[in-house]
Amino acid sequence: EFEHNVEKYTIPRSYIGKGFYANQLKIWLELFNSEQLIIISTEDLESNPQGTLDKIYNFLKIPKNHKLIPEKQKKSSYPKMKNETREFLINLYKKNNAELFSMIGQKFDWDN
């Protein structure tokens, strides 16, 4: 159960630690300038796979030679997260997410 393990996974390489995206992006920005990076959200990839792939092609300045033909995959189901846990995570990431959104100039709807 997710709630049982929340406190256990607060170290940097943990589930929760990996969610501090601004911290991760800072490391990449030490190696590359922002024009060399593209930020793709999972939500965009899932809702518009071909459009997202086209965006990547444009970013890389390569021909759009491939059309995405998604394979049907079995999706795993997860237990519903408790509202208290969702609120805990929203509050935990709030400051870091604000910093991330400022860094990348876009905002994701992660408060739901």
Predicted region positions:
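PAPS-dependent sulfation machinery
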Residues: 1-13
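The conserved 3'-phosphoadenosine-5'-phosphosulfate
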Residues: 5, 26-99, 105-112
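Acceptor-substrate binding/catalytic loop of class I
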Residues: 12-20
